Regions:
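The feature captures the catalytic groove of carbohydrate-active enzymes
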Residues: 181-203, 307, 311-329, 335-345, ...
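Alpha-helix N-cap and coil->helix boundary residues
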Residues: 345, 349, 448, 452, ...
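Long, well-ordered core segments of solenoidal/helical folds
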Residues: 243-251, 289-309, 350-369, 456-474, ...
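Short coil/turn segments at secondary-structure boundaries
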Residues: 254-259, 524-531, 587-591, 632-634
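C-terminal capping/lid segments that line or modulate ligand- or cofactor-binding pockets
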Residues: 8-48, 321, 326-341, 469-514, ...
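Substrate-binding groove/exosite segments of carbohydrate-active enzymes
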Residues: 229-335, 339-340, 347, 355, ...
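Terminal accessory carbohydrate-recognition/targeting modules of carbohydrate-active enzymes
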Residues: 1-232, 269, 561, 599, ...
Length: 635
């Protein structure tokens, strides 16, 4: 048995400036607890108010719901329909359905305090008895504090604050003893039959009418703030909402960040940072919360391995994929955020780890001057439960495209730990990464680094040009064993547009003959992760034909580099139409979508609240708010 401490990797020390940022983020009431969207937590104390629901019966079948997550798919699980979630948690709203009970839970800030309002909704109860709603209070994460229930309040005392919690709960005398004895709650709590609205307040006892008024004021403030975005209001609401619900406090690192969905994070022990997923969360957060955008980008970089690369994943316990990385989108993310806010310290914080990562690709993933994916199982420390490390499967996972048909025939060289497969997408993303990083070096006054990076970019740009196939009219991946081009097309074949590596003439051919070709990529729902005429498209299984926000986003950024305003506009609008379909219907932000029907609910392998699905809306936000750049930089 391997000891825990033998292989866990601690986080690097944070700079004073970044510590200050985290201190600003990690304060006040919000849905900080990864385990439940119905829990309100006060930071930095760690004081939590949990909402529980007990299903009662006169026969058998009693059950208790102590936590709730968006998108849980196990049989009989609660169904959560997320509503607005302000960046700082000043207003939240959700609906929950479980065992025939339906409720609405709203919260709002009242100065430094919080109010919570639970309202029963019309439903089809499964028993003769009403549900019992429970509000319990404790301290999370081993934080010091004591909680005492008194006659009319629960008082919580920590070294930082003393907080009194009150409830409008009213219990019938004949029900009180049974409720107190039989609820499966070990902490101090309030409980009542859930037959009318119930309110909870911290700081002072408030009437239900006063709580409702505070909630309504917060709701109006949220609506007004979103409305100020004009025609982009709907997408701003969606991005703010998905990132609001997906942002948590991570107690191991004492940090606020936006890992992927809570369902994923819980199953990975409390949190999981995937490289490009969390970089893209940072990009989207930049439309409304600068500190959160910085935190998501910096925390992704702080997860780097001993070898100097950002791993495929970094999870609870300090475990990482030391064998493999993921797509190099860090520099374009950081530079894009910098260009919104122009905070030099942010570039200074990010530049050194980005440069290490950029150098690592060239040193460890180069075959014959081409970049390819890989997985080196000899890297330490080894994650022993990760059976993909040092295998062909691990090398494909480095692409982020776990089961893409592009790699069905790609060979893995166990001696070099690499796929023998020149990858158009990787080379294009890497060149774009180099160009963004060189610009950062210019801003920071690092001429030697800028020269080094541009030389590397130029070298790989020359090699990428050799992957242009004039017969196919597109850049093609290449089997480095046989020298044969692969005719299996995915959105990554358009990534040379992102790197400005295609000539205007090549871009025109690629767009006309392939992107706008309904037999390949165009259609009502765009764009599939493999061409529609590929045999694997019919699988509609993960990266085998489904539509993914990050692919659309990178292709759209590429289109913006060329004089294709109408195609860019249509691409953005079609992406947004796809996103809105289930956002409006169910409040879902899907991990991926069916390439034929545009739905995400048709399979279990599409998380219902995965923030990068909102990139489909972010594309439209860019289309509406940022003018297309001049294409003159493209040769």
């Amino acid at each position: 048995m391997t000891s825990r401490t033998a292989t866990e990797e601690p986080l690097p020390a944070a700079s004073p400036r970044y510590q200050q940022l985290q201190a600003r983020l990690g304060v006040g009431w919000n849905t900080w607890d990864v385990h439940s969207v119905t829990t309100q937590v006060l930071l930095p104390d760690g004081l939590a108010i949990h909402v529980g629901l007990k299903h009662n019966s006169t026969l058998y079948g009693d059950a208790f719901l102590g936590d709730a997550l968006i998108g849980r798919l196990t049989p009989g699980a609660e169904q959560v329909f997320p509503g607005p979630h302000a960046w700082e948690g000043g207003y939240t709203d959700l609906r929950l359905s479980w065992k025939g009970h339906d409720l609405r839970l709203q919260t709002a800030h009242d100065g430094a305090n919080v109010v919570m309002l639970a309202t029963p909704l019309p439903s089809q109860p499964l028993s003769a008895l009403p549900a019992t709603i429970v509000f319990s209070v404790n301290y999370l994460w081993g934080r010091p504090g004591s909680v005492v229930k008194e006659a009319r309040r629960i008082e919580a005392r920590s070294p930082l604050h003393t907080v009194a919690v009150y409830c409008t709960c009213k219990k019938a005398p004949e029900r009180a003893l049974a409720e107190d004895v039989n609820l499966p709650v070990s902490d101090a709590y309030f409980s009542t039959d859930f037959v009318q609205p119930v309110g909870v307040s911290s700081g002072a006892p408030l009437s239900i009418e006063r709580i409702e008024a505070i909630i309504e004021r917060a709701r109006q403030n949220y609506a007004q703030s979103v409305a100020r975005s004009g025609k982009s209001a709907e997408v701003v609401d969606a991005i703010q909402t998905v990132l609001g619900w997906d942002t948590i406090y991570e107690p191991e690192g004492r940090r606020v960040l936006s890992p992927v969905s809570r369902v994923w994070s819980v199953s990975w022990g409390g949190y999981v940072i995937f490289d490009w997923d969390t970089f893209f969360a940072a990009t989207m957060a930049s439309i409304g919360d600068r500190d959160l955008a910085y935190a998501d980008a910096i925390e992704t970089l702080r997860s780097e391995t001993q070898q100097g690369f950002v791993p495929n994943y970094a999870r609870s316990g300090g475990w990482k994929s030391s064998d493999r990385s993921e797509p190099p989108v860090g520099a374009i993310t950081v530079l894009g955020i910098y260009q919104r806010f122009h905070d030099r310290w942010f570039l200074e914080e990010a530049f050194t780890p980005l440069l290490r990562w950029n150098r690592w690709w060239a040193a460890h993933r180069d075959i014959q001057g081409y970049l390819t994916w890989g997985s080196d199982g000899t890297n330490a420390p080894a994650n022993l439960d990760d059976t993909a490390r040092g295998t062909r499967a691990g090398a494909i996972l480095e692409s982020g495209l776990d089961n893409s048909p592009m790699y069905d025939d790609a060979a893995y060289d166990a001696a070099t730990h690499k796929l023998e497969f020149a990858d158009v997408g990787l080379m294009s993303m890497y060149i774009a990464d180099c160009d963004a990083l060189a610009t950062m070096a210019d801003i920071l006054g690092e001429p030697a680094a800028a020269k080094e990076i541009r030389e590397r970019s130029a070298r790989y740009r020359v090699k990428l040009e050799t992957l242009w196939n004039s017969d196919a009219g597109i850049f093609l991946n290449k089997d480095l064993r046989t020298g044969q081009f692969s005719l299996r097309l995915s959105p990554t074949n358009f990534y040379p547009l992102l790197a400005k590596a295609a000539t205007p003439q090549q871009a025109e051919v690629m767009i006309k003959n392939h992107l706008l070709n309904p037999k390949e990529f165009w259609g009502e729902w765009i764009i599939p992760s493999i061409a529609r005429n590929d045999p694997a498209f019919k699988d509609q299984n993960y990266w085998r034909g489904r539509i993914w926000g990050p692919m659309n986003y990178l292709v759209y950024l590429g289109l913006r580099n060329y004089d294709q305003p109408e195609v860019s506009r249509q691409f953005a609008e079609k992406s947004y139409d796809l996103f809105l379909q289930e956002w409006k219907k169910n409040g879902h932000v899907h991990e991926n979508y069916n390439g034929l029907t545009g739905t995400g609910d048709d399979v279990q392998s599409s998380d219902r609240f995965y923030h990068w699905g909102a990139l489909l809306g972010y594309i439209q936000y860019l289309n509406e708010t940022e003018p297309l750049p001049s294409p003159t930089a493209v040769r």
